[in-house]
C-alpha cells in the first residue's frame, strides 16, 4: 500500500509513560473521528483535537510507496546509535495505515514501535507499546495495552468508564485550550482521590518542542 504521512521528526516524547525519551514521530495523515478541517469540527466525533494531520506537506512528510520506503524515512531522522530506537506512530489515526508490512520494516531497522491511537481499531500484531486515548462518542475496541491516556475532562468519557480495562498504566491528561489551567487542577484532584490514575502533562509544549 501507499502510506500517506503528514510529518516525520525527531523529538522527545512529551506525554505518558515514555515521557522524556528520544523518539522519531511518524504522523500518519487521516483520522476516522474528524476530517481535520475546521469547517467539520462541530460535527466531528472528536471536537477538541489540537493536531494538524491533513495532507502530506509537513516536515519530511509525503507518500511512501512501500513499507521499506517508509521505514527508511523514519530511520533517516534518528540521530542516535543502533540501540534504544523508538518510533511513535501517531496521527490522525495510525491504525488506518500502519500494517504488518510497515511493522516488519520498522522492526528490521531496530525500532521499538509505539502507537498513539483512539482505540477504535484493533491493533495489528507486533506493536510494542500501545497507548489508547479514548474519545467520548467513539467505541473502544482496543481494550488492552501499555497505557490508557484520557484527555480530561470529557463529559461523556469520565475515567470510571475505562478503569477496568486491561492497561498497565492509566493517565489523565488535562485538555488543552483556554481552560487548561482549570482542567489541570481538576485532573490533579481526580488523581489524588483515585490513585490508579496518574497525571500526564504535555511537557513538550512547555519546552517548545514539536
Curated annotation (Swiss-Prot):
Matches recorded under PROSITE patterns: RADICAL_SAM
A single GO BP: queuosine biosynthetic process
Residues reported to bind Mg(2+): 51
Record: residues binding [4Fe-4S] cluster: 31, 46, 49
The protein's annotated pathway: Purine metabolism; 7-cyano-7-deazaguanine biosynthesis
Membrane spanning stretches: none
Cofactors demanded by this protein: [4Fe-4S] cluster; S-adenosyl-L-methionine; Mg(2+)
Keywords (A to Z) from UniProt: 4Fe-4S, Iron, Iron-sulfur, Lyase, Magnesium, Metal-binding, Queuosine biosynthesis, S-adenosyl-L-methionine
MF GO annotations: 4 iron, 4 sulfur cluster binding; carbon-nitrogen lyase activity; magnesium ion binding; S-adenosyl-L-methionine binding
Cofactor descriptive note: Binds 1 [4Fe-4S] cluster. The cluster is coordinated with 3 cysteines and an exchangeable S-adenosyl-L-methionine. Binds 1 S-adenosyl-L-methionine per subunit.
Domain Radical SAM core: 18-210
Annotated S-S bridges: none
Domain of life: Bacteria
E.C. numbers: 4.3.99.3
Function: Catalyzes the complex heterocyclic radical-mediated conversion of 6-carboxy-5,6,7,8-tetrahydropterin (CPH4) to 7-carboxy-7-deazaguanine (CDG), a step common to the biosynthetic pathways of all 7-deazapurine-containing compounds.
Protein name: 7-carboxy-7-deazaguanine synthase
Source organism: Caulobacter vibrioides (strain ATCC 19089 / CIP 103742 / CB 15) (Caulobacter crescentus)
Amino acid at each position: 500500500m501507499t502510506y500517506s504521512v503528514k510529518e516525520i521528526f525527531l523529538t522527545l516524547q512529551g506525554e505518558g509513560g515514555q515521557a522524556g525519551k528520544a523518539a522519531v514521530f511518524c504522523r500518519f495523515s487521516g483520522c476516522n473521528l474528524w476530517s481535520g478541517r475546521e469547517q467539520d469540527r462541530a460535527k466531528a466525533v472528536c471536537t477538541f483535537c489540537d493536531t494538524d494531520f491533513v495532507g502530506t506537506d509537513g516536515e519530511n512528510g509525503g507518500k511512501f510507496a512501500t513499507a521499506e520506503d517508509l521505514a527508511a524515512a523514519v530511520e533517516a531522522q534518528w540521530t542516535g546509535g543502533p540501540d534504544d530506537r523508538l518510533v511513535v506512530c501517531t496521527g490522525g489515526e495510525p491504525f488506518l495505515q500502519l500494517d504488518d508490512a510497515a511493522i516488519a520494516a520498522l522492526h528490521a531497522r531496530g525500532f521499538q514501535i509505539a502507537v498513539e491511537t483512539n482505540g477504535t481499531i484493533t491493533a495489528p500484531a507486533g506493536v510494542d507499546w500501545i497507548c489508547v486515548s479514548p474519545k467520548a462518542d467513539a467505541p473502544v475496541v482496543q481494550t488492552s495495552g501499555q497505557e490508557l491516556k484520557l484527555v480530561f475532562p470529557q463529559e461523556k468519557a469520565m475515567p470510571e468508564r475505562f478503569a477496568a480495562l486491561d492497561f498497565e498504566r492509566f493517565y489523565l491528561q488535562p485538555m488543552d485550550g483556554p481552560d487548561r489551567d482549570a482542567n489541570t487542577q481538576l485532573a490533579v484532584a481526580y488523581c489524588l482521590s483515585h490513585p490508579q490514575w496518574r497525571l500526564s502533562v504535555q511537557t513538550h509544549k512547555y519546552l517548545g518542542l514539536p
